[in-house]
C-alpha cells in the first residue's frame, strides 16, 4: 500500500497539469471559434473578459443556438464538479456579426460575474448572486445586470471606433 501513494500523487498532479493547460473558453464550432477570435481582436473589452475567464475555475462552452429560448443570447450554469464550474453561453446565429460580438461581450460579463463568486455552484446560488447584483428580466428564470449592459455598450463603442474595421 505504501507504494500506491506516490502513484496516486503522480496521477493527481498529471490531471491537475492537464487541467491547467486546457482552455477554459471552448467554442463548440469553427464558426463560433471564428466569432470569439474576431471579437477578441476587435474589442479590448472582450479580450480582457476572455483572459479573466481563462484565469478562473470556470469552463465555458460557447455555442450558437437557434430556438425560441434564446432570442438573442443567454448564459447558464450547467453544473459544478469538484473545483470546476461548467457554464454555457448561447448566441443566436441569425443576428448580424457585429450584434453577435456585442452580445458575446455582454454574456462574457455574466460569466465573469459567476466566476468571481466561488459560492455560485448551482441554480439556487446563481439565482441568489444575480438577485444581489442585478434584477429579474424576461421572466423568473432570467436576470440582467448593469455591468453586462455597460460591457455591451462598451463593445459597441469599440466596434464603432475610428480606424476599426467593421465586422
Please describe what each predicted stretch is.
Residues 1-8:
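Bacterial N-terminal signal peptides that target proteins for export
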Residues 25-33, 83-91, 128-136:
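Acidic/histidine-rich, surface-exposed loop or edge segments in extracytoplasmic proteins
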Residues 33, 38-78, 98, 123-167:
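Metalloprotease/metallohydrolase-associated module, dominated by Zn2+-dependent proteases
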Residues 68-99, 111-114:
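Active-site scaffold of zinc-dependent metalloenzymes
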Residues 108-124:
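Catalytic Zn2+-binding segment of zinc metalloproteases
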